[in-house]
């Protein structure tokens, strides 16, 4: 069960942040609202607030930030990039403007953290699960952002990554979700992909890569 943290942090824990889509950027925010308005109208439901998720993983004195973001979003040289993938269409990934990266960033920062809704949510405080989550980050599938190449019924994006990592590392997902009246597009894709592990489809790989592994997984841009 997720809980909001009181002052002071656990020695080990996985903290989930919900950031309003487009926090800090009007272009993304307004496009997100337009997308949600169209989607809600098609599905005959009220429009919801859209959220982007990120994680902070604490193990003793170490702190890692886990996030999917555009490759051009920060100039920090050592930001723990372990996976890269294309945005929109596979062949567009050859251009940096259409490429995302997955970060496992030691002592990293989450842009616009001050805009997170309801502060950090403690998903779990088990050190073994936290380590397992860190090991899984480089194994995230580098599929195309915004598309459903894995046939999960939902598009792949930052929320998919976070849901996949939490579920594959053994966290209880039954009470984990966006804030009230909110929606996290892509979240279901991560849960579906994680569930395939239980069905013997090996969607959560068993090989291990420690928190300091430097290998970056990339697709071949077609």
Predicted segments with their positions:
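Non-catalytic ligand/cofactor/substrate-binding and regulatory segments of enzyme domains
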Residues: 2-151
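Intrinsically disordered, low-structural-confidence terminal and linker regions
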Residues: 3, 219-221
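Short terminal or interdomain "cap/linker" segment that borders an active site or interface and mediates
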Residues: 179-219
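Active-site nucleophilic cysteine motif
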Residues: 147-169
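Short helix-capping/linker segments at secondary-structure and domain boundaries
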Residues: 62, 167-175
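Surface-exposed patches in mature extracellular/periplasmic domains of secreted proteins
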Residues: 145-149, 173-178
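Charged/polar, solvent-exposed surface patches and flexible loops
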Residues: 131-139, 164, 185, 189
